[in-house]
Structures are given as structure tokens and as C-alpha cells.
A protein has these predicted regions:
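A short, N-terminal "cap"/entry segment at the start of jelly-roll beta-barrel domains
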Residues: 1-41, 48-49, 120-135
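Conserved hydrophobic/aromatic beta-strand scaffold that supports enzyme active sites
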Residues: 30, 38-42, 58, 75, ...
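Short loop/turn positions at the edges of beta-strands in beta-sheet-rich folds
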Residues: 34, 53-55, 62, 72, ...
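Structural motif
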Residues: 37, 58, 65-67, 91, ...
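Short, conserved beta-strand element in jelly-roll/cupin
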Residues: 42-43, 52-68, 107-110
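Histidine-centered metal-chelating micro-motifs
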Residues: 48, 74, 83-84, 88-94
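A short beta-strand-loop-beta hairpin characteristic of the jelly-roll/cupin
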Residues: 58-80, 95, 117-119
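Ligand-binding loop in jelly-roll beta-barrel domains
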Residues: 88-116
């Protein structure tokens, strides 16, 4: 039998992410199709400037507040209920978390492989220090 759709309680899934993490982010992959991947993630600390080469990214803030920097624009506060979009190869960073927990629903088009994280300053991190996937 083929499954035509799946349903997710995003609010409840976000609550299952750990309170603390050794990585900058922790995520749950909800879908992982070639055309797009969808995740819920929590940001635990500042995230240095980085980019992804494989996908455009849509970020919908579920809870909390943070500063985000996209390309050369000044830092801007984002909060629950806001959607952010940027194209592949766009440098972005989260210099400060203003309110915890800071959780986000992310849609990457096309799919973003977990190792597609490139720090502007390579000393700032690796794909392994960037994110841990749960579930």
C-alpha cells in the first residue's frame, strides 16, 4: 500500500529535542526526499557564518527569538511566526539567541545532505560540530 501523505505535530516534535547539546543545533528529519527535505531543529548557541551549496532554505521560527545575519545585511531579530528565505550559497549566521528555546521548521529545496555545511572560517566548525540528528 502506498502512503499518499504524512502528518506531523510540529509543536510536539520540537519539544522532543534535547535541552542541551554539544553541537550548535539538533534536528529531527521529517522528510528526506530528493526534491526537498524538511526538519525541525533547535539552536543552542551562536552559529558562525556558513552556507549550503545544494539547496535554497526556508526557515519558519516556531519558538524563541534570535538575531540572524544574511549575506551582507545587518543583523535582524527574528521571532516566532516569521519565515526567512535565502538561496543556496548565501552566507548566513545566528550571532545571538535572544530567547530560548529557539526552534525552527526548515524546508530545504532540493534536499540538503547533512554534510552540506561550509563555514566561511573553516576553524569555526565542521558538519559534525554543526548538527546532530535525532530520530
Amino acid at each position: 500500500m502506498s502512503v499518499e501523505g504524512r502528518f506531523f505535530n510540529i509543536t510536539e516534535l520540537a519539544k522532543t529535542l534535547p535541552e542541551t547539546a554539544e553541537t550548535m543545533l539538533a534536528d529531527l528529519r521529517l522528510t528526506d526526499e530528493q526534491a526537498a527535505s524538511c526538519r525541525v531543529f533547535r539552536v543552542y548557541r551562536s552559529v558562525p557564518a556558513h552556507y549550503h551549496t545544494s539547496c535554497d532554505e526556508y526557515l519558519y521560527v516556531l519558538t524563541g527569538r534570535a538575531e540572524i545575519v544574511i549575506a551582507d545585511a545587518p543583523a535582524r531579530e527574528i521571532r516566532s511566526g516569521e519565515l526567512v528565505f535565502f538561496k543556496k550559497n548565501t552566507v548566513h549566521a545566528v550571532p545571538r539567541i535572544l530567547e530560548h528555546p529557539f526552534t525552527v521548521l526548515s524546508v530545504d529545496t532540493p534536499r540538503r545532505p547533512p554534510d552540506d555545511v561550509h563555514f566561511v572560517n573553516p576553524a569555526d566548525g565542521t558538519p559534525q560540530s554543526f548538527i546532530k540528528t535525532y530520530g
